[in-house]
Amino acid sequence: MKTGVLPVIILGIIVWVGLRGTPTAGDQPAGKQGQGKGFPDLVAALKATPGCLGVETAKTGSGKQVIFAWFEDKKAVLKWYHSDTHRRVMKQFFPGRDYRKPLQEVPEDGGPILAIASITFAEKPRFKETPLPISQISIELYRPVSGGISLGGRFAPEGLKVPKLRDYTPKGK
């Protein structure tokens, strides 16, 4: 297995566990649904992580379950990675596994990070690396670029500073 693949799978499993209790349109609000037996509420744990600016969940038209988590910087992402919740779930799925140093490729002074975790469920397990019935799993990291527009609000949390973002919302609204 290529270096770095297993950590992505592990993070994906953690996302899967969190999404099992994640609402989609028409569902109950987060925290009102029962979590999988013995699984923590990952969305709540992400939101409670120092430096996490906000969390959103979604289900795409293609069937992906997605968590969007915005962090102030690399330090904040590492706080989540090393949190008790995250480590406990990693150990639960892969006990005794040694992990490489996370975020080695991410510069220390790079600013905010958007982590997008997605998973697509399948009828049966497809990968030897995990017993999960999935066809796809991914953890991707992104950074904001200058520009964009908004009117009446943004998808990103207000605490995320985007250079040269044009806000057309009338004052007082």
Could you say what each language-model-derived stretch is?
Residues 7-18:
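Bacterial N-terminal signal peptides
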